[in-house]
Regions:
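N-terminal transmembrane hairpin
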Residues: 81, 88, 95-101, 123-124, ...
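Hydrophobic alpha-helical transmembrane segments
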Residues: 72-76, 94-109
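A membrane-cytosol interface segment of integral membrane proteins
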Residues: 163-221
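Hydrophobic, well-ordered secondary-structure segments
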Residues: 55, 83-93, 109-111, 116, ...
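Conserved beta-hairpin
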Residues: 103-150
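Acidic surface patches and DE-rich sequence motifs
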Residues: 18, 128, 162
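Acidic, Ser/Thr-rich low-complexity segments on the non-lumenal side of membrane proteins
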Residues: 134-176
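N-terminal membrane-targeting/pre-transmembrane regions
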Residues: 1-93, 217-221
Length: 221
């Protein structure tokens, strides 16, 4: 069954937020899959203001940022290692838990615990009114020339390239760690596609339910 195309005119785009104040805030965007929890009550996000990242050189201030807290990283690491231990029990039985000859399994699980912890702690996402960053890599979301969705290890994600040649990749689940982070990024993508003609693919349009630019009068499309 083919889905009917939705179209959007440039004049109907949501306004761009002010670079300094971030107002008006972009509307709630489609495709958000994270927990819509206020950041001041979330147990899984870092709250230490000293760890807030700086904006990219010459760009507008940071309006929102997200990094997994130590507690959140520990919980995630323990859950993944317990899952791995459960799989090991299904394939090897439970003898490995106490038997010395299976020390290699314990060593693997210990290493996995550390690796997963630092994996979750290492990702820091931030956004201003017109840019989004992962660590030191960033793009201007209102100047995107290419926005495509791809399958990455751990889930589907998006590839962004702006007019300055900067590129950024992230998984949708990562950017869904914070509602405002998602809304700011989506609004920029929407403007780039509708007003700027950024190149997209079918997977992105399906995932984010992106509308198409309103065709010119007399166009056959």
């Amino acid at each position: 069954m083919l889905m009917q195309r939705r179209y959007l005119q440039v004049k109907d785009l949501p306004p761009r937020p002010d670079p300094v104040t971030g107002l008006p805030r972009p509307p709630r965007a489609r495709g958000f899959i994270g927990p819509d929890v206020p950041k001041d009550v979330s147990l899984f996000r870092e709250r230490d203001p000293a760890l807030q990242p700086s904006p990219p050189p010459g760009q507008s201030p940071v309006l929102v940022w997200y990094r997994e807290s130590r507690r959140g990283a520990v919980i995630a690491a323990v859950m993944i290692v317990l899952l791995a231990a459960g799989i090991a029990s299904l394939t090897r039985g439970t003898a490995w838990i106490m038997h010395a000859k299976y020390w290699g399994v314990w060593a693997f699980l210990a290493v996995a615990l550390v690796v997963v912890y630092f994996f979750f702690r290492g990702g820091c996402y931030s956004a201003g009114a017109d840019w989004v960053a992962r660590g030191k890599k960033w793009v201007k979301v209102y100047d995107l020339v290419k926005v495509t969705s791809r399958s990455y290890p751990g889930g589907p994600g998006v590839y962004l390239r702006d007019s300055g040649g900067r590129t950024l990749r992230f998984k949708f689940v990562d950017l869904s760690s914070d509602r405002m982070l998602w809304d700011l990024t989506y609004n920029g993508i929407l403007h780039s596609v509708i007003a700027g003609g950024a190149r997209t693919n079918d997977m992105l349009r399906r995932t984010l339910a992106l509308p198409y630019p309103e065709p010119d009068e007399g166009s056959d499309s």
